[in-house]
Curated annotation (Swiss-Prot):
<keyword id="KW-0963">Cytoplasm</keyword>
<keyword id="KW-0547">Nucleotide-binding</keyword>
<dbReference type="InterPro" id="IPR010918">
    <property type="entry name" value="PurM-like_C_dom"/>
</dbReference>
<dbReference type="GO" id="GO:0006189">
    <property type="term" value="P:'de novo' IMP biosynthetic process"/>
</dbReference>
<dbReference type="InterPro" id="IPR016188">
    <property type="entry name" value="PurM-like_N"/>
</dbReference>
<keyword id="KW-0067">ATP-binding</keyword>
<keyword id="KW-0658">Purine biosynthesis</keyword>
<comment type="similarity">
    <text>Belongs to the AIR synthase family.</text>
</comment>
<dbReference type="GO" id="GO:0005524">
    <property type="term" value="F:ATP binding"/>
</dbReference>
<comment type="pathway">
    <text>Purine metabolism; IMP biosynthesis via de novo pathway; 5-amino-1-(5-phospho-D-ribosyl)imidazole from N(2)-formyl-N(1)-(5-phospho-D-ribosyl)glycinamide: step 2/2.</text>
</comment>
<dbReference type="Pfam" id="PF00586">
    <property type="entry name" value="AIRS"/>
</dbReference>
<keyword id="KW-0436">Ligase</keyword>
<dbReference type="InterPro" id="IPR036921">
    <property type="entry name" value="PurM-like_N_sf"/>
</dbReference>
<dbReference type="GO" id="GO:0004637">
    <property type="term" value="F:phosphoribosylamine-glycine ligase activity"/>
</dbReference>
<dbReference type="GO" id="GO:0004641">
    <property type="term" value="F:phosphoribosylformylglycinamidine cyclo-ligase activity"/>
</dbReference>
<dbReference type="GO" id="GO:0046084">
    <property type="term" value="P:adenine biosynthetic process"/>
</dbReference>
<dbReference type="InterPro" id="IPR036676">
    <property type="entry name" value="PurM-like_C_sf"/>
</dbReference>
Length: 339
């Protein structure tokens, strides 16, 4: 009797079972433009050319980094997929694009159908929050490649914007105003440092300033800003945007500025959430290091003309969204200055 693929560590039947388990969640993400269902060699999406007569496709790909280690150690697999979606769709939103569809890549050492379905369920939830369709993906069983119970996840998002509506920051000028939207925590960045300071023995501990266990605060999924920001983009009053990921406010905002411009941010403009101050205190992390590593409670930034600030604030408040006027664009020096 010769060897079988299953004996080598790859269970095709388990893969098929995982597909059946994930189908209901995937089905909830379908948009009218989607053609066909799961199981094809490629995902099909018919772009609405009435809505996008001059389409520019915007794409983004990302993973969730070492935040995965928390999911493994906490045995929490239902939200990490939302992180993967958020990291991709928030990036393409910066260019003014509406996310249209998403594909995922999940690699495992041993395929456990129920766990795979949990992960993909989180991806589907993220797609629902972003309004995009999950039109395909790949689940790869790779025996001997990952430790027991571990996996890796990555995503790929495609969106569209009409060419005249593309947002590239080129219209930003000195005196324009920064408006920040709150994050839900560390999002998916800085977890190598987070895990160095917040060791697993602390995750079940209740810190009064957090109002929950540390573990719950750490595993909370990345916010998806699409449905909050798209209406603002449609108002044509947004000059530039930044998704605050690795590098924090310090590194990410300058990426969208024309040459010769910088940013002045008032540190008193918002209260840094307790999760960040707790990490800074326990790890004795310097302020500058915090600001160039973490989002510090601000997950997304809009830049608008001064005369449009009230309009943007009113729109956000009507949508139940908090926002903070962080500072302004400066013509005096490049980079970010904290006041």
């Amino acid at each position: 009797m010769g060897y079988s693929y299953r004996q080598a560590g790859v269970d095709i039947d388990a893969g098929n079972q995982a597909v059946e388990l994930m189908k209901p969640a995937v089905k909830r993400t379908v948009r009218p433009e989607v053609m066909g269902g799961l199981g094809g060699f490629g995902g099909l999406f018919a772009l609405d050319l009435k809505k996008y007569p001059e389409p520019v496709l915007v794409s983004g790909t990302d993973g969730v980094g070492t935040k995965l280690k928390l999911a493994f150690q906490m045995n929490r697999h239902d939200t990490i997929g939302q992180d993967a979606v958020a990291m991709c769709v928030n990036d393409i939103l910066v260019q003014g694009a509406e996310p249209l569809f998403f594909l995922d890549y999940l690699a495992v050492g041993k395929l456990v159908p129920e766990r795979v379905a949990q992960v993909v369920g989180g991806i589907a939830k993220g797609c629902e929050l972003a309004g995009c369709a999950l039109i395909g993906g790949e689940t790869a069983e790779m025996p001997g490649f990952y430790d027991e119970g571990e996996y890796d996840i990555a995503g790929f998002a495609v969106g569209a914007v009409n060419r005249p509506d593309l947002i590239d920051g080129s219209q930003i000028q000195a005196g324009d105003v920064l408006i920040g939207l709150p994050s839900s925590g560390f999002h998916s960045n800085g977890y190598s440092l987070v895990r160095k300071i917040f060791t697993p023995d602390l995750w079940e501990k209740n810190y009064p300033e957090l109002g929950e266990t540390l573990g719950e605060a750490l595993i909370r999924p990345t916010r998806i800003y699409v449905k909050t920001v798209l209406p603002l983009i449609e108002s044509r009053k947004v000059l530039g945007m930044a998704h605050i990921t690795g590098g924090g406010l310090t590194e990410n905002i300058p990426r969208i500025l024309p040459e010769g411009l910088g940013i002045k941010i008032a540190r008193s403009a918002w209260q840094v959430p307790a999760l960040f101050t707790l990490l800074q205190r326990l790890g004795e992390v310097e302020e500058a290091e915090m600001l160039r590593t973490f989002n510090m409670g601000i997950g997304f930034v809009l830049i608008v003309h001064p005369e449009d600030v009230d309009f943007i604030q009113t729109q956000l408040q009507a949508a139940g969204e908090k926002c903070f006027v962080l500072g302004e664009v400066s013509g005096q020096s490049e980079g970010v200055s904290y006041l």
